[in-house]
Amino acid sequence: MREAFICDGIRTPIGRYGGALSGVRADDLAAIPLRELLVRNPRLDAECIDDVILGCANQAGEDNRNVARMATLLAGLPQSVSGTTINRLCGSGLDALGFAARAIKAGDGDLLIAGGVESMSRAPFVMGKATSAFSRQAEMFDTTIGWRFVNPLMAQQFGTDSMPETAENVAELLKISREDQDSFALRSQQRTAKAQSSGILAEEIVPVVLKNKKGVVTEIQHDEHLRPETTLEQLRGLKAPFRANGVITAGNASGVNDGAAALIIASEQMAAAQGLTPRARIVAMATAGVEPRLMGLGPVPATRRVLERAGLSIHDMDVIELNEAFAAQALGVLRELGLPDDAPHVNPNGGAIALGHPLGMSGARLALAASHELHRRNGRYALCTMCIGVGQGIAMILERV
């Protein structure tokens, strides 16, 4: 069987909501790592790229009408290189890698770029058309995150719990305490801060160069969402606004962020022809559905499914990158999979609670981080897994090359 390999990857820093990257359109943001991949790999013939596949969860504003194609052109790739945008909400970036890997395994391509982008700062307000003449029922939605234009049957049959409310549901179901969640969040901040100060995160990042109207140039080099001075006392003091006697706070949840990532996926033969060095083999990927109100547990069945496909167990994984949408759901996943809350090989360099969660980009970031960490640890297998809004999970296994 033909195999698909991650040969290189890069990402932008992750910006805070309204922060350093908020002035950058999503298509321009996605073009940055695409362009950098060509710079980093001068022997790569861009004419040989079969497709560019990017995940993006919003697509309601400047990221509309196939942002992958827009970014491909803006990055200076040949017009002959096609691009497509996929949407599996939070799992979009990881799903993009899966699409690329399947294309190679099926013989439908040899060289692809896959990744994701999200500019949550620039997500627009949207309003639907009137359903009748002179209607006064117009409703406006903030597209940054959450439900919009809800189907009444969906609301009736499955509810429309917000993302924090789904985390509350998981915490209540599995009896995950506020104390355990805050401790998990603190570890995320501490591990991320250590990874940033040691230069580990910098290995993944291409700086973003910005110029203001006065011509002043600023270079954004580092992720800006993390709070390295966070203490347990500070986390304990935050209010839980989503439910009476709730446990979900701004401190034990991921952020609303901006960022983009791109990875080169190639067959073994094409990698050799293009002077690329395979770093990780994409072994298998799986998705699974769960009850929408418990969407945070989606990684559990997805992980079990991908492990079965690969003929492996959770204990074969040397690195696990689990997206931290909320501490409650991350802990729920760990406990359901039989892993300790503070497993050192799970998010060893922190996670989304500290780094942030630009929806369409996050899955690609997980795969990039996992491929780097496998080489640092001389490990063999890595698992990347995420929960997905409306009740899904996605999981991918990588093998170090």
From Swiss-Prot:
GO biological process, one term: 3,4-dihydroxybenzoate catabolic process
Active site: 90, 357, 387
Pathway noted in the entry: Aromatic compound metabolism; phenylacetate degradation
EC identifiers of the protein: 2.3.1.174
Enzyme class (EC, first level): transferase
Known function: Catalyzes thiolytic cleavage of beta-ketoadipyl-CoA to succinyl-CoA and acetyl-CoA.
Protein name (Swiss-Prot/TrEMBL): Beta-ketoadipyl-CoA thiolase
Organism: Escherichia coli
Gene name of the record: paaJ
